[in-house]
Amino acid sequence: LSDFHYPQNTKLNAFDLSVIMNNALNNCMENVSGDDPYISISSFRKNSIFMITIKNSFGGQLNFGDSDLPETTKSGREHGMGLNNIRRVARMYMGDISLEQGNEEVILSIMMQVE
């Protein structure tokens, strides 16, 4: 399910957006679960703010530890970098991310200033 629109006439670089979308969708594809699995992508722009919300069904439990981002359960040097890469790009645009879990889904919200 998608209601995503690329914002026109902004300073948002297409490569930066691809880093966000690639990492977020990889996370979703690796973790989507449940009886009726789904991934949902939506976005909107209000003035200079561009918001992206990505949801996926998830029957597990995220472990946040001491961070506001969940700990990875994978091994290897590159694993666990996806959300950090998304956050790095969002902060380049004076924004940030949040991750929530509830009702058997995970919700990733990304906010950026694009003007």
Model-derived regions, located:
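Conserved short strand/loop->alpha-helix "switch" segment adjacent to the catalytic nucleotide/phosphoryl-transfer site
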Residues: 2-20, 77
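Conserved ATP-binding N-box helix of the HATPase_c
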Residues: 14-36, 88
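Short beta-strand/loop element within the Bergerat-fold HATPase_c
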Residues: 38-48
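Glycine-rich nucleotide-binding loop
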Residues: 49, 60, 102-109
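Glycine-rich/acidic phosphate-handling loop/turn and adjacent ATP-lid/helix
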Residues: 50-80
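C-terminal beta-strand of the catalytic ATP-binding
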Residues: 56, 109-115
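Conserved glycine-/histidine-rich ATP-lid loop and adjacent helix of the Bergerat-fold HATPase_c
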Residues: 85-94
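Glycine-rich ATP-binding loops of the HATPase_c
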Residues: 94-104
